[in-house]
Amino acid sequence: QIALARLLAGALSGTPADAAADLAVQCVPVADAVTDEAAKAFAGAEDCFTLGRGVTAAIAFECGLKLQETCYIKARAYHSSDFYHGPMAMIGKGTKVILFASGKALGGNAAPLREDSVKCANKMLELGADLYIVTDDAALFAGLPAKVLAVPGGKTEAETAQSLALAAQMLACKTSCLRGLNPDSPRALKKVTVTV
């Protein structure tokens, strides 16, 4: 939605679309293609974990929320660094895990985040998880027996986050449809909440 708004604003103002909007346009067909098999796998899932670190943690939380509200999957989202402190004990053979990982980082120093993403992926696999990695840097996970859902990356982690989020939303939407549900009309979603 944000990318479409940027494209529309650019068209109406006569100014070129920004890089993030262009990236989203490139990402749609790729994300559509790479999420097909994952959605089939998640269609039968009762629970899963979604993990990320840095900016990708927000995407992990959003993906978990979408899987909960549109697919009725008991999805639990964590920062990957926090996951090591207890929740990891819930991972066993066949536990579905989605790891969101970017090859970039805010501030430019991606090395620690990249290393942590690989460490997390290896640990999940060691514990027997059925691991799906949504990333703009498939080479980072080369050789791992995980399902890598590679999407185009941007020049920055913030731009790349948009591509990862698009893949997360497509995965939830497709999974919901495969479960015979309507992702546009979840049973308990309220558009307006009142907080006192």
Residue ranges and their predicted role:
Residues 1-196:
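A SIS-like phosphosugar-recognition module
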